[in-house]
Amino acid sequence: MNKSYWGLWSLLFVALMLFGILSYWQDGFGVGGLNFKTASFARDLGLVSDGTAQVKKTTETDEKQSSELWRAPMDTTAKNILFIGDSMLEGLAPRLAAYCDKNGHTLVEVIWYSSSTLCWGESGRLTELINKYHPDYIFVCLGANELYVPDIKRARRPFVRKLLAEIGDIPYVWIGPPNWDKDTGINDLLKQELDKGCFYFSANDEFERSRDGAHPKRSSAHKWMDRVVKWMETEGAHPIRLSRPADGISRATHIVIYQPPK
């Protein structure tokens, strides 16, 4: 091979080497005031990363971790559960009792007919029940008797806060009212005051209603309780062991009934 061919091959080799090297140069380069964009085939082939995928993956991981920081890990120990509320407990509590039977929990059911956050907040009754039964988990279902209270955020906020103060550090879930009509703000108030992952918003759920048009039929209330439990597993701040029992109900370990407030 003569010298002219050797020269051409040498130039071609140098050009290919230069092209390959520059393809790994991610930010381009400048010569004499001119900017040149380098080739991207190395990144396209996955031979070099521009960092975008890694940054995206890291960001998604960080977001997932930060979104779960407020959630406690699943607690699989047996619980002593206190369930307080209004007449909605007639449908909810028997289904929760079935969950408790299956999972080794005890359940104290306390129905105060026609009660509200006002009644409970003024009475100090929750503190009395906590001192008597020593629950380590609390369910609350209140708000159904407060759908039409005017200026409710001003009128009832102190009593919601009083109840939360009585609950203290005990893990809890507050089941919101099963709206049959638009409310004046009880759900907004509860959303504002309750801790993240502790309020189950029921207003948009679908229910089969009993003849009074307000209370869900018993079968519909059982499904309501099932939805609450499922939500606790995925979105609740304090998930506990609540494996689903067969369809059906049971009876709470203790049942306490208070007549409507005067």
Task: Tell me the role of every PLM-derived stretch.
Residues 64-68, 72, 76, 114, ...:
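Alpha-helical context
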Residues 64-65, 89-91, 182-184:
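Short amphipathic alpha-helical surface micro-motifs
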Residues 70-156:
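Conserved SGNH/GDSL esterase-like catalytic core that processes O-acyl groups on lipids
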Residues 1-80, 233-262:
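N-terminal secretory targeting modules
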Residues 2-9, 14, 122-241, 258:
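Alpha-helical cap/lid subdomain in secreted, periplasmic
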Residues 82-118, 218-262:
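Mobile, glycine- and charge-enriched loop segments
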